[in-house]
């Protein structure tokens, strides 16, 4: 351990005072960045990422290239009665053709935004013969999903027939085409998702479900642990195990390159403050990030989880991978802790289904306040979304608390905002709960990991009854969206019990 690390104290957060090229910014650089930011905002550019990038050398690996982008194909069709209408909802006054055109365009636009190909059927289904022919077409072409839009409340039978084709089915019923009785029979069927709404974002989220499932299927998770090389599966995700020494060796041959200097500079310069980490820590953390990218490329994988504590406890590497893992999460590429496969799959779920990073954590009960503290040393900063225009959460650079080595992000989560907790505890089953951010805990005075978020749980009377370990927390109340995904793809959902002694609640 270096003298820098040995001299660290347990005093409260203060910015270190030594000059450090990896975490300082000159006045000229600051003014240039500010001008670029103003230009970006006034011209409405698609991404603010350019503020922090530089020309990449041929040797550098684009982190975003690991995020799977499989082809996703959805067949879309209108189901209705033969017009003109006389009585019956949506009503004779309803502008049938203009609404058909508007929603058709909205569905196409939603698909384009998230990378889903929409194949629109040319004519609406208005009789039994057309329905039967379309069902045969679906069974023959086997798209990833079918989206059925209803334009009459007597067309629910058509939706049911299409759902029997054996392909995941999204039913969109604009308000005015369904009563509760229409929806109830189909809405809770496995493999089906029913939207009764005027909200276009609900259609886009349904298409994200289809895309997320394909992304999980396309993901190969690198598990860096143990001494053997083998393959496996966890639900939809393929697994590639490699010996832990593979990463240790990769780190040892990764130099302090220009990329490493830039990565350290960027992460340090955007921090609210820097407490324990030194310049050397920043460069080693950047080397770990680059080594992880190279290992992923060498193994042909899309995500990884490493035996990070084993490497650090045995002093095989001089830094935990926390800073690099946080950067991975910010680019939509999963980097899980402790070679834990289920939590890594949970991180993928939030990233693929909602385009925002999750926070894998240890659950700590705070019994005086009756809140759960979600605590770990890796959190992404783009918790509002992977879109680079969205502001990242403020963060403080700290050491990894258990070892007092390296660089970890203490991300400050927004108090008062809702959050969702998910964890695959089996390949086909997950825990699902929600809550609200109540505060951020500093270390010290607390012990434990650097990002520690207080969560006041919904529908759980006692924080000690929250189920799971290494749950993944992400911003927003997405309970219904997660339940919809699980219903579509046959995943069992379990909620923590409301009161102590009650059994866990299935969704």
List the predicted regions and their residue ranges.
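Gly/Ser/Thr-rich loops at beta-strand to alpha-helix junctions
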Residues: 80-82, 125-129, 148-158, 173-181, ...
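N-terminal secretory signal peptides
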Residues: 1-25
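N-terminal export leaders
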Residues: 25-43
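Extended hydrophobic packing segments that form well-structured cores
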Residues: 404-507
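Conserved, well-structured core segments that form the ligand-binding/active-site neighborhood
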Residues: 34, 40, 178-354
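Metallocofactor- and cofactor-centric catalytic cores in central/energy metabolism, strongly enriched
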Residues: 50-156, 160-176, 210-211, 240-259, ...
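C-terminal catalytic subdomain
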Residues: 332-437
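Bacterial signal peptide processing site
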Residues: 46-47
